[in-house]
From Swiss-Prot:
Possible role in chlorophyll and/or carotenoid binding. Its main location: plastid. The lineage of its organism: Eukaryota, Rhodophyta, Bangiophyceae, Bangiales, Bangiaceae. SUPFAM superfamilies: Chlorophyll a-b binding protein. Gene3D superfamilies: Chlorophyll a/b binding protein domain. Belongs to the ELIP/psbS family. It is found in: Plastid, Chloroplast. Disulfide bonds: none annotated. The keyword Chloroplast applies. The gene is ycf17. One of its GO terms (cellular component) is chloroplast. This is Uncharacterized protein Ycf17.
Amino acid sequence: MKKSLWLWGFTDSAETWNGRFAMIGFISVIFIEVVTGQGLLYLIGMMS
């Protein structure tokens, strides 16, 4: 039987990728706030 490269669930690989994407998202939000001078919620219209 061939072993699958991707396993479902809370595996070390899945948690590593989750952390990487979370860091990219966090840095992106900070970058947007610095460039525009406004928060993300204000930019998407949730705060007026």
